[in-house]
Amino acid sequence: MMADVIVIGGGLAGCATAYYLAADGVDVTVLERFDLNMLASGSNAGSLHAQIPHDPFVRYGEGWAKNYASTVSLLAKSITMWRGLGDELGADLEVKLRGGLLVARTAEDMRAIERKARHERAQGLEIQLFDRADIAREAPYVSEDMIGGAFCPDEGKANPFAATPAFARAARRCGVRIERQAAVLGIARTSRGYDVATSKGVFSARRVVNAAGSDAGRIAAMLGVDLADVQ
């Protein structure tokens, strides 16, 4: 059977990709080598972030931030989607958007946060700069050693144990086939698309999406693609 798209990986990215494709009428098969939501998608804090990551900003500087900044508006749009995602998928994802706080211990830390905030605000992200008094009032549980920080009111979290299964159920309702315990062993190009050899047999599709997370490098190498670790 020839699918339109094979999605390799049954985590959050893979199941969400399958759902949105199928909702648009695309015939999709998901291949998961273990079970859904088993690896990183099901073992994280569920954080929904929009701010530019602080440590890479400090490490790589303004040039890196300018390249990354265009991602901020995309992240902000994704959080807007999360607000209504539970209703769309018919599940309680336990989304709570109560804001995210990045704190500074030193004046140097605070200067970096202020520089970073300029890039974030330029992309339309709401950032409130806090001094020590603001932190004491809004986050009294934070150590008194922290002298300030940046607060983004749109950040929050979702339940990582609920999100992927909800996407998978919605994907199935749209006709997606999900194959568990289907470890990918090789991928071959054909005149019609791709043959994906797995531990459960060969699956064919016109296109392949690599959503394999930590295994993405190995999957890409099957097609001669090197996923370099680029910051």
Feature map (PLM): residue ranges:
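Conserved Rossmann-like nucleotide-cofactor binding loop
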Residues: 13, 36, 215
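Helix-loop-beta segment of a Rossmann-like dinucleotide-binding subdomain
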Residues: 91-104, 116-117, 123, 128-132, ...
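Hydrophobic anchor at the start of a short beta-strand
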Residues: 26-28, 127, 208
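Helical element adjacent to the flavin cofactor pocket in flavoenzyme catalytic cores
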Residues: 150-207, 211, 215-218
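N-terminal Rossmann-like FAD-binding beta1-loop-alpha1 element of flavoenzymes
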Residues: 3-30
